[in-house]
Amino acid sequence: MTGPYFPQTIPFLPSYIPQDVDMTAVKAEVAALGVSAPPAATPGLLEVVQHARDEGIDLKIVLLDHNPPNDTPLRDIATVVGADYSDATVLVLSPNYVGSYSTQYPRVTLEAGEDHSKTGNPVQSAQNFVHELSTPEFPWSALTIVLLIGVLAAAVGARLMQLRGRRSATSTDAAPGAGDDLNQGV
């Protein structure tokens, strides 16, 4: 499985690219403009690519004018295009599906961007995708560490209070109670 249409990063997974998608033409348009799209949508998508570049994102966009049977081919197209650009993020849009590829962003970020990119309007979809990529992520690791430290501190505090309560109960029971027990027995 080698050749110009198969990326070398995942050689054991077959790609599914619809027969009606001319990957040679798509790759040539992306190389020339950064966008492969029908002429009506190209100017708006070029603006999005420029905005992404201003945000520090090397974005390539492929727009299909029809839907494939499912979204898998879009990710495969993005992977094939992305194989030529090691630092680029590739977004592939169809009327109802979205696919993406990037070596710069984690899959969870790409999936979040894809979720916001299913608008039916390619320019708005691409803008939403760029916005999601440029939005800082919530620091989940820091929150997890703070919560773990808080739970540990609460557990240690509860144990110390338990030991202090047991110690004070033992000392108050032993001192006054020792003489009373002897007097009651006589």
Curated annotation (Swiss-Prot):
Major location (coarse): membrane
CC per GO annotation: plasma membrane
Membrane topology summary: Single-pass membrane protein
Function: May affect the expression of genes linked to host macrophage apoptosis and immune response, thereby promoting the survival of M.tuberculosis in host macrophages. Overexpression of the gene increases susceptibility of the bacteria to various stresses, but promotes intracellular survival in host macrophages. It has no impact on the growth rate in vitro. Overexpression causes changes in the transcriptome of THP-1 cells, including expression of genes involved in cell proliferation, fatty acid degradation, cytokine-cytokine receptor interaction and immune response pathways.
Region of interest: Disordered: 166-186
Keyword annotations: Membrane, Transmembrane, Transmembrane helix
Residues in the signal sequence: none
UniProt xrefs under InterPro entries: Rv1476-like (IPR046498)
Native species: Mycobacterium tuberculosis (strain ATCC 25618 / H37Rv)
Protein name: Membrane protein Rv1476
Localization in the cell: Membrane
Residue ranges crossing the lipid bilayer per the database entry: 138-158
